[in-house]
Amino acid sequence: MSVAAPAHKRILLKLSGEALMGDDAFGINRATIVRMVEEIAEVTRMGVQVAVVIGGGNIFRGVAGGSVGMDRATADYMGMLATVMNALALADAMDKQGLIARVMSAIGIEQVVEPYVRPKALQYLEEGKVVVFAAGTGNPFFTTDTAAALRGAEIGAEVVLKATKVDGVYTADPKKDPTATRYTKLTFDEAMSRNLGILDATAFALCRDQKLPIRVFSIVKHGALKRVVMGEDEGTLVYA
């Protein structure tokens, strides 16, 4: 009996910094990051090419910094540096799982991580390495969601997988409304008209214009990433 082939060959996984905290109030929870890497390792060993964009909200949020009197651009650069720290932690955990990870930063910190160069990133993916994109887009005023959309389009990912703590997009907040139901799929226009806030407006527009589908799923749900990659009904698909 033949094993089913993955539905996706190349994916862009967007992880929030907050997802790395686990139940902690701040920073990186080692057990959480190890568990996430186990999920990533499973799909990588199925032959899926995986690129990751990581946020920095567990260490520093540029938006929050800007709101308390700090210059917004400075705060955003600090947020970008936070994503580099997260990317290094993620790559370290991947190395310990037997994966080969490469961190590529949108801002130059050559002694620590290599700069983002698109052909090099594509080469790494073809070689079966996991590429972790750090420092967002390298520009202030752009979120790591936008970086995920941008890098996803650049590397020719088949889908952007937005990993959250909820298993999809709901009609209302499932924690507050017991009648809330999960959308299995939505068009970009439907998601916009319902103001569901799946990604920020810039990221969402980029995905829509490039016809790059988004799937929202729970990273805390064991096996969810594999089910998404296999094309099963997991999370919520947003498509053109």
UniProtKB/Swiss-Prot annotation:
Principal subcellular localisation of the protein: cytoplasm
Disulfide bonds: none
Database matches in InterPro entries: AceGlu_kinase-like_sf (IPR036393), Asp/Glu/Uridylate_kinase (IPR001048), Uridylate_kinase (IPR011817), Uridylate_kinase_bac (IPR015963)
GO CC field: cytosol
Positions that bind UMP: 56, 76, 137-144
Pfam annotation, one family: AA_kinase
Alphabetically ordered keywords of this record: ATP-binding, Cytoplasm, Kinase, Nucleotide-binding, Pyrimidine biosynthesis, Transferase
Catalytic activity entry: UMP + ATP = UDP + ADP
Enzyme Commission number(s) of this protein: 2.7.4.22
Binding site for ATP: 14-17, 57, 61, 164, 170, 173
GO MF term set: ATP binding; UMP kinase activity
Entries under CDD domains matching the protein: AAK_UMPK-PyrH-Ec (cd04254)
SUPFAM superfamilies, A to Z: Carbamate kinase-like
Keyword check for ATP-binding: yes
Pathway assignment: Pyrimidine metabolism; CTP biosynthesis via de novo pathway; UDP from UMP (UMPK route): step 1/1
Group of enzyme by EC: transferase
Subcellular location: Cytoplasm
GO annotation, biological process: 'de novo' CTP biosynthetic process; UDP biosynthetic process
Alphabetical list of PANTHER family matching this protein: URIDYLATE KINASE (PTHR42833), URIDYLATE KINASE PUMPKIN, CHLOROPLASTIC (PTHR42833:SF4)
Subunit comment: Homohexamer.
HAMAP family: PyrH_B
Function description: Catalyzes the reversible phosphorylation of UMP to UDP.
NCBIfam families on file: pyrH_bact
Similarity comment: family membership: Belongs to the UMP kinase family.
Protein name per Swiss-Prot or TrEMBL: Uridylate kinase
Chain's gene name: pyrH
